[in-house]
Each structure stands twice: as C-alpha cells, then as structure tokens.
C-alpha cells in the first residue's frame, strides 16, 4: 500500500503531551517498581496446533508436514466501459493439500466493501461512489449447482433442512458454501462462478485500492470471487476475516489464465505475461517494444498520437487481451483509452533483464518522469538485499489509487514506485497475512525503503535515531501492539502497520548489527518464498539465524507497547575506574551501550575486553542485555580505561533503543538552553542522532 510518512505517524501529540511528560520525568525513580523481564515468546493456540501437527516448528522454517492450498484460476471478463460494469466467468481448480476434509468453502467477495451493507473502516476515503457490490449469478462445485438463495434462519423447534443442495450464505465480504458431502483431504475440486459488478467511480479523492475515473480509465482489483485461504493455523482452516478497506489481504498462491475483453484502442496493464501481443498491439508498437531489454533507456512506446482503434491496437470494436501468471497470489488490471506507454528494463542479479512498463495519462508525465529509474533501482536493489525479483515483469499504472500493489502490477504515482515495488517481496513473494499482521509487509517495506533511499543517494542508511524515536509514543492508550489484529487496530493503524517495524528493526540492529539483521531477513525470505509465514515463524527464524535468544526483544516490540527509557543516573571515579550507574525506567530492556569520550591527551587508554576504540579518543563499550534479567532497574557499568580524563559519556549513542527523554542519556547533562531546543529531524521524520 502507499508509502506513509514516518514523521506524521510517529510524532503524534508530542506537544500536547509535554506537560504530562515533564511531570513523569520529574517524578521520583521510586515510582517505578523493579521489573520482571519476560523472555519467552507467547504462543497462541493456533501456533501450538501447527507445532503439534509438524507444519511449523521452532526452527522458524516450514515444518516437515507443511502444506498450503493451491488455486488455479481461468477467468474471462468483459468491461462495458460506458456503463462501468465488469462481467465475468471463472473456473477455479482447488488442490486441498491438507489432511482435513472440507465441509464448507469460503469465498472472498471484496467488492461488497462498496455495497450498501459494506462495513468500512473509519479511515476509508469517502470519495467513492457506492455500488451494489458483486452480484454472483451462478455457482457450481464439481458441477453441482449451489443454491444462491440465503438459507432460512433456524427457528427453535424446527428441524434443519436436508442438505440436498449446497447452501450459500453471504456475510458482507465473504460467502460460505455449506456442502452436503465433505470434500476429501488431499483431493481437488472445481468451482465455477458467474458474476458482475460496477466499478466504483472516484471523484475528488483517491480510491480504495481501485476505481474508475469517468468512463475512460479503470483500475480493477478485488474483482473476482476468490477462494479464501485455508491453512494450518486457523481452527476450521478457513480465513473468514472481513475486508474493511483499511487492512489488506491474505491470498492463496496459484496459476492465473485470464482473458480481458475491452474496447479496441484501449491499452491494458495486468498481472502476468501478455500471451497474444500480435492480436492486441499494432505492428509498430510491437517493434518498439522489441528493443525494451536492450538498454536502461526509457522508451516511449505509445504516445497521444497513437490513441484510438487502428493505431496502438488493431482496428475494430473490441479486443481480448490474454494474460498468464504462474505462482501468483492475486490478479489485478487497469485499462484506458488515454494511456501512453513507456518501457524500460531492470537487470536482476542472477536472472538478467526483466521488462518494466509504465501506463499513465499524458497530463501526468511530470509525475512519471522518474518512475522508470525508480522502479529499476528498486527491483535491482531489493534483489540484492533480499533475493532476486521473483516475477517476469513489472507494470506501473496510473489511476485513482496512487499506491497499491499486486503481483507484477502497481497502481502507483511515480513517487511511490520504490515503496510499491518493495511489496513484490512482501507480501507478493512471502504470502503473509496482511489482514492480521500489516507490519510483516508494510513495516518491513518501510524499513527497506530507508535502505533503498540511502543507496540512491550514495549515503549510509539513516537508521540511527529510528529505534529511539518509538519512545516518544510508546504506551499511548490508542496504540495497539503489533500482534493485535491490524483489521481492528483503530486510529493508530498506520503507526502499527507502517512505522513501528522499521523502529523495531533499527533497534534490533542496535543489538546484533544492521548487516546481521539484513542477512537473517534475506535467509528468511528464501526459506518462505511463495509460502505463508506467520509472525512466530519470523521470530523463531531470526533467533536461529542470529544465534540469539531474543524472546525478550520480540515480547516487548510485538506483544507490548514498551520502551527502554534509559538514563545515566550517576558517574563517579575512584583511581583508574569510573562507575557509570545506568537506569532503565521502561519495561523493555536493552544492551548497555556507552560511548566514552576522552580528553585528547593524557595517560594511555587501557584496553577493555568489551570495548572498541572508535578513534583515538572515543571508545564504545557494550554489556549484554542479560545484565537486566535479574530484575534490577540499575546497572553499575565499570569503565577501567586507566587515568585518562573522561569528558563525556553517552548511553545508547546510536539512538537505537526507545527513549522518551534523550537528554538524560548524556553525562554531564546538556545545558538547559541546549536541552530546550527542538530536535533536528532527518528525511524520515526521525530525530537526528547526536550520540
């Protein structure tokens, strides 16, 4: 989904809260009781069931009995551009790879978000014209017709109806088909459906991940009845979470064979590879496209001079565009008679060049001027960071929603192409449950966007300060923990899904090192490629990859809203030993990291086993987080560098651990007038670290 400003999401109500914070900071330390540090990872019933079944385990890798549903779609759809109506037929072959028989089938009907009874999240935009939702007019399972009349409500004393035909019951954005005979484990079934819906018009704002501008441009997504995920985690198997328009999706992987019938003269961008270019593109357009992979230049393939049937496309009334996508979790498309087409390439390490296409309105050429280079850099950089881009093409399409991702296609303005391209890794390649755990795709993506931006600028990633900034909001009563269902995260959904994960990963870098974090996440990405990792798989995988027991870390960051709130309480010197009393008033522990700044001249600085000399007069000294596991809130750090004068000591000098008041991290304390100055902020809205 669209890139969100970390500044807007992290610096919330700081000025309004200042008086209360000042009182809290002035309170006696005795107000904070000794703390018991929780060091295990809480396990819910669903993950315990998966462990017991052997589908997942504490290695963090897919278990020996891991399985997932597989869905193959064959879809034919027609767009009535004047009416804005899409009519379709689908045939879905579903492979049940589980040990469980299916007594029901659950379908996703996400277009009902726009229907009269759609339950929409509070932050869903109101620029959308409501429709009648999706109208399913025919449905069969293995050739047996499904009765589309909702079943009568049960009345006490009335015997249940005999299951002569499968029954169909719609609950807003999902439908349950109750089967008269269970579908066998390790078997397959075929579902066929006919449906139609009106694409919602968008005026004066943005769409909810799709929409139409007038009757000349359509972004089409969440547009076909989709078989819901059936996995090893839920009791009963099926994902029945409602689509509310804020949190996103959870999809099966499978194969898509899709034919789209649109007016001649309209260009189509879609998930997958176009199978019939000779039938839908004019010879001159195909000839220009034949040079796409020859260089990094952006080629102008279709210009306004090519608008209309018989120019960019063959003449006639209508054309059918045929796309095929292997191993994808969804299919989306966009079409317009006003699109121009630019083309370039990205060179993927180990794979070679892949085509990158951009379909946009001529009036938006300034916004799209850098779309090609941005998308190229994103695909190449993230391929090296995590793993090679998994798909054969990427298409960016203009339209009412300027920041939404689908496999191989992005509804995006040029400025968001780096962020949206990152989603081709999560969740398009690692199929996480975005509806529940938005941080596993949006949050990870925000983190990698920080790295990508720095790479484009030939700078070091500005991760210092990111982790520390969480202390400014931690404990807010409106903040849901990251493990809380993102569908119901409330007013701080954006913070929970987008902002907190990069803070967490910055903090983890402060514990184990940024390069170690990125190496472990690359290994995690390879292990779960085209599978469905859960948060527990991620946590256990990272523990094993980093050779650390990080239960204390995961608990504080994911299951709670804790902060470190560390400080230097006292410094005293006797002989050649300086004792620094460090205090942590928050519930989250951290390693004790001190930057010790010496006078430029004086007696020799003696080495310490847990210290590294940064330069001739600065040492970085670290004690592991274990020093807090006994429950104390204070730790006496012994500095045994000899008799060289120490001029300054800073706790958490790289600003990685959540802290509300950073001024008490420094000894001696900053001057009062300096402390009153507002903190500088970097590009991502984070305080500039001055450690």
Predicted regions and their residues:
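Hydrophobic alpha-helical and helix-loop surface patches within well-folded domains
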Residues: 24, 38-51, 55, 70, ...
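Early extracytoplasmic/domain-onset interaction patches
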Residues: 27-108, 504
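A surface-exposed beta-strand-loop module
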Residues: 29-34, 85, 95, 101, ...
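Surface-exposed beta-strand/loop patches in extracellular or lumenal glycoproteins
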Residues: 93-131, 244-248, 253-263, 536, ...
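Solvent-exposed beta-hairpin/edge-strand motifs
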Residues: 102-158, 263-266, 597-610, 622
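Glycine/proline-rich low-complexity spacer/linker segments in large multi-domain proteins
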Residues: 117-130, 196-256, 277, 655-691
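Hydrophobic helix-coil surface modules that form long, contiguous segments used
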Residues: 227-238, 244-418, 446-447
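Beta-strand-rich binding/interaction modules
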Residues: 269-270, 282, 334, 571-653
């Amino acid at each position: 989904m669209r890139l969100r400003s970390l500044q807007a999401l992290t610096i919330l109500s700081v000025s309004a809260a200042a008086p209360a914070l000042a009182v809290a900071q002035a309170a006696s330390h005795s107000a904070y009781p000794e703390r018991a540090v929780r060091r295990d990872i809480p396990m819910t019933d669903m993950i315990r069931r998966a462990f017991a079944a052997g589908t997942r385990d504490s290695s963090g890798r897919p278990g020996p009995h891991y399985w997932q549903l597989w869905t193959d779609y064959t879809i034919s759809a027609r767009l009535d551009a004047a009416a804005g109506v899409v009519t379709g037929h689908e045939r879905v072959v579903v492979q049940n790879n589980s040990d469980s028989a299916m007594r029901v089938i659950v379908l996703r009907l996400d277009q009902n978000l726009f229907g009269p009874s759609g339950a929409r999240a509070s932050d869903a935009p109101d620029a959308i014209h409501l429709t009648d939702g999706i109208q399913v007019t025919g449905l069969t399972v293995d050739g047996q017709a499904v009765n589309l009349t909702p079943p009568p409500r049960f009345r006490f004393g009335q015997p249940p109806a005999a299951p002569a035909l499968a029954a169909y019951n719609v609950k807003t954005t999902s439908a349950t088909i109750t089967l008269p005979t269970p579908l066998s484990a390790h078997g397959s079934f075929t579902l066929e459906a006919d449906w139609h819906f009106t694409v919602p018009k968008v005026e004066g704002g943005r769409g909810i991940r799709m929409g139409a501008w007038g009757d000349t441009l359509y972004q089409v997504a969440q547009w076909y009845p989709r078989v819901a995920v059936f996995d090893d985690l839920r009791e009963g198997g099926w994902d029945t979470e409602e689509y509310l328009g804020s949190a996103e999706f959870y999809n099966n992987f499978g194969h898509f064979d899709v034919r789209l019938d649109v007016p001649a003269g309209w260009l189509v961008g879609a998930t997958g590879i176009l199978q019939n270019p000779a039938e839908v593109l004019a010879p001159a357009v195909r000839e220009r496209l034949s040079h796409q992979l020859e260089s990094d230049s952006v080629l102008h393939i279709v210009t306004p001079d090519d608008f209309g049937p018989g120019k960019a496309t063959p003449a006639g009334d209508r054309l059918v565009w045929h796309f095929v996508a292997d191993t994808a979790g969804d299919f989306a498309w966009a079409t317009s008679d006003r699109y121009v087409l630019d083309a370039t390439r990205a060179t993927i390490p180990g794979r070679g060049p892949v085509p990158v296409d951009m379909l946009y309105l001529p009036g938006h050429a300034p916004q799209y001027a850098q779309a090609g280079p941005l998308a190229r850099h994103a695909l190449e950089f993230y391929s090296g960071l995590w793993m090679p881009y998994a798909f054969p093409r990427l298409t960016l399409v203009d339209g009412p929603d300027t920041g939404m991702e689908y496999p191989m296609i992005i509804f995006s303005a040029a400025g968001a192409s780096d962020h949206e391209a990152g989603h081709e890794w999560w969740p398009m390649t690692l199929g996480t449950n975005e509806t529940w755990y938005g941080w596993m795709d949006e949050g990870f993506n925000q983190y990698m966007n920080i790295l990508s931006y720095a790479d484009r600028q030939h700078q070091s990633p500005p991760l210092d300060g990111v982790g520390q900034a969480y202390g400014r909001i931690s404990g807010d009563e409106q903040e849901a923990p990251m493990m809380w269902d993102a569908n119901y995260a409330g007013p701080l959904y954006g913070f929970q899904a987008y902002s907190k994960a990069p803070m967490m990963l910055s903090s983890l870098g402060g514990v184990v090192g940024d390069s170690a974090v990125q190496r472990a996440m690359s290994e995690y990405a390879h292990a779960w490629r085209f599978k469905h990792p859960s948060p527990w798989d991620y946590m256990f995988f990272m523990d094993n990859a980093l050779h650390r027991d990080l239960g204390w870390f995961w608990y504080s960051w994911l299951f709670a809203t804790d902060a470190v709130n560390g400080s230097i309480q006292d410094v005293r010197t006797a002989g050649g030993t300086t004792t620094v009393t460090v205090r942590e008033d928050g519930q989250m522990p951290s390693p004790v990291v001190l930057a010790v700044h010496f006078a430029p001249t004086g007696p020799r600085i003696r080495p310490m086993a847990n210290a590294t000399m940064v330069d001739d007069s600065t040492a970085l000294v670290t004690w592991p987080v274990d020093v807090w596991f006994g429950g104390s809130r204070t730790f006496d750090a012994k500095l045994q560098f000899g008799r060289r004068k120490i001029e300054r000591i800073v706790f958490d000098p790289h600003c990685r651990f959540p802290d509300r008041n950073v001024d008490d991290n420094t000894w001696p304390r900053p001057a009062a007038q300096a402390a009153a100055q507002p903190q500088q902020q970097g590009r991502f809205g984070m305080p500039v670290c001055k450690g």
